[in-house]
Amino acid sequence: MDLFIIFKSIIKAGPTVLLPIVIFLFAVCFRLSIGKAIQSALTVGAAFAGLKLVIEFLAKSLGPATKAMVTHMGVQLNVIDMGFATVAAIGWSSPIVPLMVLALLGTNIALLLLNKTNTLTVDIWNYHHALTVGTFVYFETDNVTVAVAAAACTGMFVYKMADWASPLVSKYYKLPGVTIPAIHALMNLPIAVPINWLFDRIPGFNKIDFNMETLRKYFGVFGQPLMIGLILGVGIGFLSGYDPYQAFGLGINMAAAMMLLPKMTHLFVEGLKPISEQARKVTDKKFKGRKILIGLDPAVLLGDAAVITTALLMVPILLGLAVIIPGNKLLPFADLAALPYKVAMVVALTNGNIFRSLILCTIAFIPYFYLGTWTAPMVTAAATTVGLGDSIPAGMMISSLTGTTMPITFIIYKVFVGNLMITVPILLGVFFAIWFFMEKKVMPKVELRDSI
């Protein structure tokens, strides 16, 4: 247990500390020289720290504006979104977290050795999504085995979804050999992919392509990321009831984020490149040409201007949905600052088409409101159990746009707290059918298309 205490201490330090350590170990395992391994690990660590600083700056600018917008719009709902950090704290504070972490690591390694996944995740921090599912199952059933199985099942789903989403990462974000095994980044794809397929077949509609290049072409300097950040920031400021000076200040902050994020992403890729190249050489030799994918935090995707633009435009859209959706009690708040993570893969799916990304994200987020409302009592009780009760506003319940608010994690949770003899075979049967369809029908076509 002493070893796990050390591990948990590193985890508590956050991904900025964890990532360079994991990257260094990863580089050494792939026989990169110690000097190059240290250089790559520190470069990746510095880039990730830079990304986090800019994202935190974005969140601190957007958070007060969002709160003011809620007040200005007169929205009154009794379930508040406390953000992914609160839900992550519940997951990492579970009494059975050592067993769940081992199960997630073991599942990843077993699937790799059995050639059932190509994703090798170094993004240990985002285990918290699976840990949260397992924790909620444990609190509901008081059964350690079932809870650990729920976490492992969530991990299996994530690793396979990361495999299937990897062409989007390599093609749109130009990050070959990388994927994103984070369920909050992948979650909207099961809803967005079939709807996007339908959109491709609607005459006229399928010709609308409103992307960053279109903005630059038709709007000149006003289509540049800096100006888009300024305009969107000022617009959000006015919707929040800010005076012109405050609104302009918010606009400057959004413009700064739009400019700095791509630079940090470029530095991240620069640090990762030697490891990716060495990993490719080793895996080509040891695994007979298998392409092992490095699973990273979705922060590496946030350097794309279309992602930030889509995320900023989704803020008032989600607040509007909170008001008009019948039966909803969830008020989006803290996780609005994390929207870039949640929209990034949809933006890649549409190849940067902001118009289509907004429609797909709007549709995909609708279930979140109902699931967040339904699971709020459970999330509130779990937060109180692990000692987070003081953070809950008086007279309110808490939820988030992560945890069991996401459709797949909600389904896994319900399966493992239900009649296991019925629910688990149904879940696995459906999943393996999807697995077969994706591996035999979809992915070969994607690989053929990408090779042309």
Give residue spans per PLM region.
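Membrane helical hairpin/interfacial module
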Residues: 40, 47-98
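A short glycine-/small-residue-rich loop at the edge of a beta-strand within enzyme catalytic domains
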Residues: 60, 84, 259, 263, ...
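Membrane-interface interhelical connector segments
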Residues: 63-81, 276-297
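Signature of multi-pass transmembrane helix bundles
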Residues: 1-54, 95-293, 305, 347-356, ...
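Hydrophobic transmembrane alpha-helix bundles
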Residues: 57-61, 75-76, 94-95, 161-163, ...
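Hydrophobic alpha-helical transmembrane segments in multi-pass integral membrane proteins
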Residues: 56-63, 139-142, 297-299, 371-386
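A broadly tuned preference for mixed-charge, low-complexity surface segments
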Residues: 75-83, 100-101, 283-291, 306-314, ...
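Hydrophobic alpha-helical bundle architecture
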Residues: 113-117, 295-381
